[in-house]
Amino acid sequence: MTARAAGGSASRANEYADVPEMFRELVGLPAGSPEFQRHRDKIVQRCLPLADHIARRFEGRGEPRDDLIQVARVGLVNAAVRFDVKTGSDFVSFAVPTIMGEVRRHFRDNSWSVKVPRRLKELHLRLGTATADLSQRLGRAPSASELAAELGMDRAEVIEGLLAGSSYHTLSIDSGGGSDDDARAITDTLGDVDAGLDQIENREVLRPLLEALPERERTVLVLRFFDSMTQTQIAERVGISQMHVSRLLAKSLARLRDQLE
């Protein structure tokens, strides 16, 4: 992460520094009372820029901007309703995956254009919800193993679902996108469409392809998509440059795409 990117992330955190206190005040009100609802609405209103920021990251994918903003705001409302201040976690960290999950659900319901079985679509949706819940409890993005334990399923199934989701928008990591080059952001998981995995049908097809990748490419791919690491973190773990990580990711996805075509 560049110094400017770090500064951008810090400014975003400071932007919502008053939100934790707003939630503490909410807890002191009678649940379900008019005062409680008004105060929660105030929190939602306060965080609308967060939802709108996420919605803008998904522009240019065939959905009207106003629709994306509306869907993202619904996700924000859901996050405010579900957030448990007693966990001690940060609301923004919880809200981001919740909002993103709502937007992704919108795309799944309205514009999923690749050949992914319904079972995998539903699995990816469950993973989105579980990711939001675990992120709140853990204070960080969960690993594939933690998601598997949460959902009571095999880790291979979780990996399959994560890759199925990547089939319609491979996630970019260290770039905030657009002209705002200090917007790494709120999250490292927004990115552009990559059709490289659009013919994933089942794990029997995917597993041998992953195993056939060179060890370093497979390692980088697993760290990125299954362990939720950024390119910078992967570079530090593997001992190579961030640019090299980026090239390896592109190369490994290209290999998978060629094999799946």
Curated annotation (Swiss-Prot):
Disruption phenotype: Infected guinea pigs mutant and wild-type bacteria grow comparably. A double rsbW-sigF disruption shows no effect in the presence or absence of rifampicin. Residues 209-258 are annotated as: Sigma-70 factor domain-4. Induction: Constitutively expressed at a low level under all conditions tested, including stationary phase and several stresses. 3-fold induced during starvation. Positively controls expression of its own operon (rsbW-sigF). It comes from the Bacteria. A motif (Interaction with polymerase core subunit RpoC) lies at residues 67-70. Residues 123-189 are annotated as: Sigma-70 factor domain-3. SUPFAM superfamilies: Sigma2 domain of RNA polymerase sigma factors (SSF88946), Sigma3 and sigma4 domains of RNA polymerase sigma factors (SSF88659). GO terms for biological process: cellular response to cold; cellular response to nitrogen starvation; DNA-templated transcription initiation; lipid metabolic process; positive regulation of DNA-templated transcription; regulation of DNA-templated transcription; response to anoxia; response to antibiotic. The keyword Cell division does not apply. Pfam families: Sigma70_r2, Sigma70_r3, Sigma70_r4. Monomer. Interacts transiently with the RNA polymerase catalytic core formed by RpoA, RpoB, RpoC and RpoZ (2 alpha, 1 beta, 1 beta' and 1 omega subunit) to form the RNA polymerase holoenzyme that can initiate transcription. Interacts (via sigma-70 factor domain 4) with anti-sigma-F factor RsbW (UsfX) with a possible 2:1 RbsW:SigF stoichiometry, which inhibits SigF activity. Sigma factors are initiation factors that promote the attachment of RNA polymerase to specific initiation sites and are then released. Held in an inactive form by a cognate anti-sigma factor RsbW (UsfX) until released. Increased expression decreases growth rate, and after 3 days increases the expression of 51 loci encoding 33 protein-coding genes as well as some non-coding RNA. The sigma-70 factor domain-2 mediates sequence-specific interaction with the -10 element in promoter DNA, and plays an important role in melting the double-stranded DNA and the formation of the transcription bubble. The sigma-70 factor domain-2 mediates interaction with the RNA polymerase subunits RpoB and RpoC. Belongs to the sigma-70 factor family. This is RNA polymerase sigma factor SigF. It comes from Mycobacterium tuberculosis (strain ATCC 25618 / H37Rv). The lineage of its organism: Bacteria, Bacillati, Actinomycetota, Actinomycetes, Mycobacteriales.
